[in-house]
A protein has these predicted regions:
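Core helices of alpha-solenoid repeat scaffolds
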Residues: 37, 74, 119-123, 166, ...
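Terminal, non-catalytic domain-edge segments
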Residues: 27-39, 274, 289-323
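Bacterial N-terminal signal peptides that target proteins for export
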Residues: 2-9
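C-terminal motif of bacterial Sec signal peptides marking the signal peptidase cleavage site
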Residues: 20-23
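An alpha-helical repeat/solenoid feature that recognizes helix-turn-helix modules
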Residues: 46-69, 91-115, 132-166, 178-218, ...
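Internal amphipathic alpha-helical repeat/solenoid segments
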Residues: 43-50, 76-95, 126-131
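Helix-boundary/low-complexity linker signature
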Residues: 26-28, 38-43, 150-157, 171-175, ...
Length: 323
């Protein structure tokens, strides 16, 4: 998310310092998976220069009680978003609706109504079909994910040239499916990318009552099984990454597919097994094994791990936690 780095750091400092959330990575759990989530949250607060925005932190903390009491971060986060909304008139990305979508997700996770937040309907820009498609499949997918995250209906925006509907976004996404069943950001790609395929599956998961969506989802799952590496991980643009593992984990759990499903276990290795290999001693996650800790990788790993914890506890997966 290309928000001002200064604003991001300031917002996270408000959350971390004023409300006393940082524990410098010292919190521990008897559950190694929960311990990984605790470490990721602590790292993101402690190393604010690497944070790319607080939205996913709110999603994780709101979805798993053991990470942080809501009264320690909710008000500070809402205040920082409200100030930013006043500066931009409630439109966080005039040509990048993915930015708008992620703010909607963060505000919703913090317990607020994104369709009426400080006098702004943050969902309104997602009704602009043409602007959403400036980002292609990314814009269409995130528009659906954000609206469904809080159970929001598609708003009506009289100021746009083409009023979007959820079905329009779904139809566009389906038109981008590749012969191998996967999806990719590039319109010239020949093969599916695990990150984009995982994201698309999250967007489509609520619409499998449509036969064409159900068929597309099954084809995409076949693709993800076929391109999984022997160590349980995934390669994107030539590199095995933590983010690829995280996106596929989120997609499978959203669809109700357990991580030990035989289609997604290679040589005894699950995707979660591989994801945890990216974890560093300080609690953060690397983008590529051998690299330094990366903020985006840590955010995405954190969300995937919290989602896994919720499902294992018999709770709805993380994208259904706030509906």
């Amino acid at each position: 998310m290309k928000t001002s780095k200064v604003r991001i750091i300031a917002a996270v400092l408000v959350l971390a310092l004023v409300f006393g959330l940082v524990s410098c990575g010292k919190r521990k759990s008897d559950d190694p998976i929960e311990n990984a989530a605790l470490g990721a949250v602590d790292w993101l607060y402690g190393d604010v220069g690497a944070v790319h925005g607080a939205n996913w932190l709110c999603v994780a903390m709101g979805a798993w009680e053991g990470l942080a009491p809501k009264d320690k971060w909710q008000e500070g986060f809402a205040k920082s978003v409200a100030e930013a909304a006043k500066e931009c008139g409630g439109v966080f990305g005039t040509r990048k609706l993915t930015d708008q979508a992620k703010v909607i997700i963060g505000v919703t996770a913090a317990g607020y109504d994104a369709s009426n937040f400080e006098g702004y309907d943050l969902t309104l820009p997602l009704a602009d079909y043409e602007t959403a498609l400036l980002q292609g499949i990314n814009g269409a997918s995130w528009s659906l994910i954000a609206l469904d995250f809080g159970g929001y209906e598609m708003p009506e925006n009289p100021d746009v040239a083409v009023q979007a509907t959820k079905d329009m976004y779904i139809d566009y996404i389906l038109s981008r499916q590749l012969p191998d069943g996967g999806f990719a950001f590039s319109t010239t790609a020949a093969l599916g990318d695990p990150d984009m395929t995982g994201m698309v599956l999250i967007a489509l998961a609520n619409y499998t009552d449509r036969p064409d969506v159900a068929e597309a989802v099954e084809r995409a799952l076949v693709c993800l099984s076929n391109i999984q590496q022997d160590d349980g991980g995934y390669t994107s643009y030539g590199f095995e990454t933590a983010e690829s593992c995280a996106q596929v984990i989120l997609a499978l759990l959203k669809l109700g597919v357990p991580l030990d499903d035989e289609r997604f276990v290679k040589n005894g290795n699950t995707i979660m097994d591989k994801l945890l290999e990216y974890r560093m001693e300080d609690g953060g996650f690397a983008h590529v094994i051998g690299d330094a800790v990366n903020g985006v990788a840590t955010e995405q790993a954190m969300i995937a791990i919290v989602c896994y914890l919720r499902v294992n506890a018999g709770m709805p997966e993380i994208f259904s936690a706030y509906r």
